[in-house]
Amino acid sequence: MSVNDPLGDMLTRIRNAQLRGKSTVSTPASRLRAWVLDVLQAEGYIRGYEKKETENGQGELVISLKYFEGTPVIRELKRVSKPGRRVYMATKDLPSVRNGLGVSIISTPKGVMSDASARSANVGGEVLCTVF
């Protein structure tokens, strides 16, 4: 099956797994997905992830989801920049998610990072998604 938006597919898998109360979810591996998961883990939205090899050689990422008192830690997960409409922002224009309670994940020339890290590094880039 062909997926036009691999990152959007991963975010949807995470959202659906949390709605069902699953402890883990798997998704095909890619570097961009792993970088986004690194930011989610650093910000405390997931427990972690590990890469496992599959028979076809591509590999998969097994994501351990995080809950607090039975409710998902991630309340809202939105894709901002989509394949049909890319969204780029300068440092001064980076959005604040829910008055600073959430996080935007930005793809910058210095790598994938949170909005706070991008502001401190004074770099802008493509706004991949927002998490609250």
UniProtKB/Swiss-Prot annotation:
Keyword rRNA-binding in annotation: yes
GO annotations of cellular component type: ribonucleoprotein complex; ribosome
Family: Belongs to the universal ribosomal protein uS8 family.
Domain of life: Bacteria
Pfam families hit by this protein: Ribosomal_S8 (PF00410)
Subunit structure: Part of the 30S ribosomal subunit. Contacts proteins S5 and S12.
Key words, A-Z: Ribonucleoprotein, Ribosomal protein, RNA-binding, rRNA-binding
SUPFAM superfamilies: Ribosomal protein S8 (SSF56047)
Record-level Gene Ontology MF annotations: rRNA binding; structural constituent of ribosome
Gene Ontology terms: biological process: translation
Protein name, as recorded: Small ribosomal subunit protein uS8
InterPro entries in the cross-refs: Ribosomal_uS8 (IPR000630), Ribosomal_uS8_CS (IPR047863), Ribosomal_uS8_sf (IPR035987)
Function noted in UniProt: One of the primary rRNA binding proteins, it binds directly to 16S rRNA central domain where it helps coordinate assembly of the platform of the 30S subunit.
Keyword check for Ribonucleoprotein: yes
